[in-house]
C-alpha cells in the first residue's frame, strides 16, 4: 500500500503543475465533471457520448430533470452533482475557500441530484430522494453482499458520517473506506454507487490528495467493471485482506483518473474539448 500511495502522490504532484491549470483550471474542472458523469453513467448502464453531454452543457438546457432520453437524464443528474462538488472546491489560484457541507448534507444533496430525474419520471417515489433508507422502503439497487436494514443500517451509517468528517485521516484510506461503505451499506434505496463515486471526488479534493479537482476517478470503474465488482466484493467480505485489496483498487482508480486529467488538460489547453 505504501508503494501505491507513493505512486499516487507522484502522479498528483505532476498534475498540479500542469501548464493548463495555471490559468484555465476552471475550464478543466468543468470538463472533468463532464467526463466523470459520462464514465459514471456508463457504470450505471446509462451510456451517453461525452460530445452529447457537452453540447447540452454548452446550451445550458440541463436545468430540467427529465428529457426524452432516460440515459441522458441519468448522466445529467450525475453531472449536476459533479458541478455542485466543483462549487465546494477551493480555488487553485486565489483565496476562495467555500464552506464545506456536513457529511449528512453532502450525501443527501448529491443523492437529490443523482436521483431527482428518477423521481421526476415516476421511477421512484419523491420521498426516497435524499432520504436515508427506512425499514419499510425497498432496496432498488444491488451491490456486494446483503445490505443491512433497520437498526443494523443505523449502526453502520452513523460511523460512516463520522468518518467523512473526522480530521487528520489519511486521504486515500478515507476515500476508499467511505466509497466501500456506501456501496456495501447502501443507505439509500437507489443511486448509492453513483453517489459514492462522487463523494470520492469530493474527499480527495477536500483532503488535498488531488487538489486540482480534475481527476476522472470514475474512469477505471467504467473501463474495468469486473475489477470494480470484484474489489467491492472483497471489501464487503470484511477481511483485512479484502479491505486492503479495495484500498489498492481505489488507488489504481485514482491513478487512472489522474492520467485522464492530464489528457483533458491537454485538450483544454488546445481548445479541443468540444
Positions of predicted regions on the chain:
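FIC/Doc superfamily catalytic core
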Residues: 1-274
Amino acid at each position: 500500500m505504501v508503494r501505491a500511495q507513493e505512486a499516487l502522490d507522484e502522479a498528483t504532484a505532476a498534475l498540479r503543475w500542469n501548464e493548463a491549470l495555471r490559468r484555465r483550471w476552471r475550464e478543466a474542472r468543468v470538463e472533468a465533471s463532464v467526463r466523470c458523469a459520462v464514465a459514471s453513467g456508463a457504470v450505471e448502464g446509462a451510456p451517453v457520448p461525452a460530445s452529447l453531454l457537452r453540447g447540452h452543457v454548452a446550451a445550458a438546457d440541463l436545468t430540467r430533470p427529465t428529457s426524452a432520453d432516460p440515459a441522458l437524464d441519468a448522466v445529467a443528474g450525475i453531472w449536476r452533482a459533479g458541478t455542485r462538488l466543483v462549487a465546494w472546491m477551493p480555488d487553485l489560484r486565489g483565496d476562495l475557500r467555500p464552506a464545506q457541507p456536513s457529511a449528512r448534507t453532502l450525501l443527501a444533496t448529491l443523492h437529490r441530484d443523482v436521483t431527482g430525474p428518477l423521481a421526476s419520471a415516476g421511477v421512484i417515489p419523491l420521498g426516497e430522494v435524499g432520504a436515508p433508507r427506512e425499514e419499510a422502503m425497498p432496496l432498488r439497487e444491488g451491490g456486494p453482499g446483503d445490505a443491512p436494514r433497520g437498526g443494523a443500517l443505523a449502526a453502520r451509517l452513523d460511523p460512516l458520517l463520522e468518518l467523512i468528517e473526522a480530521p487528520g485521516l489519511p486521504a486515500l484510506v478515507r476515500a476508499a473506506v467511505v466509497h466501500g461503505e456506501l456501496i456495501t451499506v447502501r443507505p439509500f434505496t437507489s443511486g448509492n454507487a453513483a453517489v459514492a463515486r462522487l463523494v470520492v471526488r469530493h474527499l480527495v479534493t477536500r483532503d488535498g490528495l488531488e487538489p486540482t479537482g480534475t481527476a476522472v476517478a470514475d474512469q477505471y470503474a467504467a473501463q474495468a467493471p469486473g475489477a470494480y465488482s470484484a474489489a467491492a466484493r472483497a471489501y464487503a467480505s470484511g477481511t483485512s485482506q479484502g479491505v486492503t485489496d479495495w484500498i489498492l483498487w481505489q488507488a489504481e482508480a485514482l491513478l487512472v483518473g489522474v492520467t485522464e486529467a492530464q489528457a483533458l488538460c491537454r485538450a483544454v489547453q488546445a481548445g479541443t474539448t468540444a
